[in-house]
A protein has these predicted regions:
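Catalytic-core elements of nucleic-acid end-processing and repair enzymes
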Residues: 1-110
Length: 110
C-alpha cells in the first residue's frame, strides 16, 4: 500500500507507512492508534486524512477482509466537519485498496 494516495480538492488521504508514523499520528491526534498497536494488525489498513495545508483531520481504519471502514476519528476520537466527506471519498476509492490487495494475494500464491 506504500504510495497509495486518495485525494480531492479539500483532502489528501495516505496510508501510515511506518511505526514512527503511527506514533506521530497517535500523538498529534490524541488517540490510541499507536499505543494499541494498530501497526501490528495485518487485517486492517490505517490511513491519515489531512487538509491541503497538511493538518491532520482524521485517522481511518479499513478492514482488509470486508473493505469497509471500521472507524474514522479526529482529535480525541471526535468526528470532524470533514467526516462525511472523508467517508465518501474513501468509499469512492475503495476499489484501489481492493486492487492492491488482489495483486498482493496473487504474488503470494505465485
Amino acid at each position: 500500500f506504500f504510495g497509495l494516495t486518495i485525494s480531492n480538492d479539500n483532502l489528501v488521504i495516505k496510508v501510515l507507512q511506518s511505526v514512527a508514523e503511527f506514533l506521530e499520528e497517535g500523538t498529534e491526534m490524541h488517540h490510541c492508534v499507536y499505543h494499541n498497536g494498530y501497526y501490528k494488525n495485518k487485517e486492517c489498513l490505517i490511513l491519515s486524512a489531512k487538509d491541503m495545508n497538511g493538518k491532520r483531520i482524521e485517522t481511518i481504519e479499513v478492514s482488509l477482509k470486508t473493505f469497509n471502514i471500521i472507524q474514522s476519528r479526529g482529535v480525541c476520537n471526535s468526528q470532524t466537519k470533514y467526516h462525511k466527506e472523508i467517508i465518501d471519498l474513501m468509499n469512492e476509492n475503495m476499489y484501489k485498496i481492493k486492487k492492491i490487495t488482489s495483486i498482493d494475494k496473487q504474488k503470494a500464491v505465485a
